[in-house]
């Protein structure tokens, strides 16, 4: 028994002795990797664990996972496309709406006011120039009267008189034409009124807008009240209690000859 135990312990010690020489081999490796780490470079990571067996592509679970990943990738791609399209549309809208900024509106308003003021000023200048031209045309240029002789003054006065005479004649002709046109317009208006009939607008009074509505409602209520449409019957055949007239007793009427006796008594009295 003791010999058997020794034989079993001897082979177990051999592997332990074989494992001891591996320690010095690990030391140089550690010494060789420590120097690069001291020079500022990180030590390489430990070797990864050995990968498991490769997955079978024909496995239904693997196929389902791949299909799920592909579907998720397609959904993400479509979402990205929609997001990009919406961003582009919003940018386009902002670019269109944001063209007339408050500053641009203010500048445009100032330019329009400036242009309107310039146009108004030009129109006033044009009217003033036209007025001066008409005055010069009708009245003529002023004459130098300080150095003029008596004969020249008379000629100037006669010229002004003739000009005034012509202007008055033209004025009278124009007024006559205006009166004539006014008369023709009034005559035509009278003819038009005669043809279509002159309509005089009557004086309107204020009426409540709810009055007609209330009348319609009352009319509808009366239509639905069927008792109002029934005829009144004066016969008392269908009354529950018939009222009997009070009859006088026979003794109060008296005998048939009592009336004649009463008349004779009254005649004698």
Curated annotation (Swiss-Prot):
The keyword Acetylation applies. Residues 9-50 have a biased composition (Low complexity). Residues 162-171 are annotated as: Troponin T-interaction. The keyword Acetylation applies. Troponin I is the ATPase inhibitory subunit of troponin in the thin filament regulatory complex. Involved in the development and maintenance of muscle and nervous system. May also be involved in the cytoskeletal apparatus. The modification N-acetylalanine is found at residue 2. Belongs to the troponin I family. One of its GO terms (cellular component) is troponin complex. The gene is wupA. Pfam families: Troponin. This is Troponin I. The modification N6,N6,N6-trimethyllysine is found at residues 201, 205. InterPro entries: Troponin, Troponin_I, Troponin_sf. Residues 56-91 have a biased composition (Basic and acidic residues). Keywords: Acetylation, Actin-binding, Methylation, Muscle protein. All isoforms are expressed in somatic muscle. Isoforms containing exon 6a1 (isoforms 1 and 2) are expressed in all muscles but highest expression is in abdominal muscle and splanchnic muscle of the gut. Isoforms containing exon 6b1 (isoforms 5, 6, 9 and 10) are highly expressed in the tergal depressor of trochanter (TDT) muscle. Residues 189-202 are annotated as: Actin-binding. GO terms for biological process: adult somatic muscle development; cardiac muscle tissue development; heart contraction; heart development; muscle cell cellular homeostasis; muscle contraction; muscle organ development; myofibril assembly. SUPFAM superfamilies: Troponin coil-coiled subunits (SSF90250). Binds to actin and tropomyosin. Residues 1-104, 239-269 are annotated as: Disordered.
């Amino acid at each position: 028994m003791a010999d058997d135990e020794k034989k079993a312990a001897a082979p177990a010690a051999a592997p332990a002795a074989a494992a001891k020489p591996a320690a010095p081999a690990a030391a140089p490796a550690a010494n060789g990797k420590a120097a690069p780490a001291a020079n500022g470079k990180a030590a390489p990571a430990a070797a990864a664990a050995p990968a498991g067996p490769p997955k079978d592509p024909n496995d239904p679970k693997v196929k389902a996972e791949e299909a799920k990943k592909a579907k998720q990738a397609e959904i993400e791609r479509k979402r990205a496309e929609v997001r990009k399209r919406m961003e582009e549309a919003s940018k386009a809208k902002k670019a269109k709406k944001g063209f007339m900024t408050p500053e641009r509106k203010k500048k445009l308003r100032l330019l329009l006011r400036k242009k309107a003021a310039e146009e108004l000023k030009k129109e006033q200048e044009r009217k003033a120039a036209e007025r001066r031209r008409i005055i010069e045309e009708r009245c003529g240029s002023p004459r130098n009267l300080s150095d003029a002789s008596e004969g020249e003054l008379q000629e100037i006065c006669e010229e002004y008189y003739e000009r005034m005479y012509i202007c008055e004649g033209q004025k009278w002709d124009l007024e006559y034409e205006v009166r004539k046109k006014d008369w023709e317009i009034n005559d035509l208006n009278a003819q038009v009124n005669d043809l279509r009939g002159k309509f005089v607008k009557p004086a309107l009074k204020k009426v409540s807008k709810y009055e007609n509505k209330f009348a319609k409602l009352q009319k509808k209520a009366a239509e639905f009240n069927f008792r109002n449409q029934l005829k009144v019957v004066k016969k008392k055949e269908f009354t529950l209690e018939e009222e009997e007239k009070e009859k006088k007793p026979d003794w109060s009427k008296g005998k048939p000859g009592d009336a004649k006796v009463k008349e004779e008594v009254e005649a004698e009295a």
